[in-house]
């Protein structure tokens, strides 16, 4: 997950992952590593954080992550049995 320290949507994404029992999130802080922002934009086509991947699948930002959860599609992506 590409993120910054001051991003409320990044914090929401982390809370949602935590609530799902995800304990390991690879965080790439583009505020601390500005050169990684270009990488993020190239990979995602977006400029905003968070940009979230689950394995090799680009999810998008927090809104897309939350929509997957509401639709019941996040748990299978995380390998959580229904």
Residue locations for each model-derived region?
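Local sequence-structure signature of Cys/Sec-based thiol-disulfide redox active-site neighborhoods
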Residues: 1-25
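Thiol-based oxidoreductase modules, predominantly thioredoxin-like and allied folds used
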Residues: 23-37
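Non-catalytic, surface beta->alpha helical segment in thiol-disulfide oxidoreductase systems
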Residues: 54-81
């Amino acid at each position: 997950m590409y993120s910054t320290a001051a991003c409320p949507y990044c914090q929401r994404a982390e809370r949602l992952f935590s609530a799902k029992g995800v304990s390991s999130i690879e965080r790439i802080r583009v505020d601390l590593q500005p050169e990684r922002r270009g990488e993020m934009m190239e990979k995602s086509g977006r400029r905003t954080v968070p940009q979230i991947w689950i394995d090799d699948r680009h999810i998008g930002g927090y809104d897309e992550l939350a929509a997957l959860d509401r639709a019941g599609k996040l748990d299978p992506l995380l390998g959580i049995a229904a």
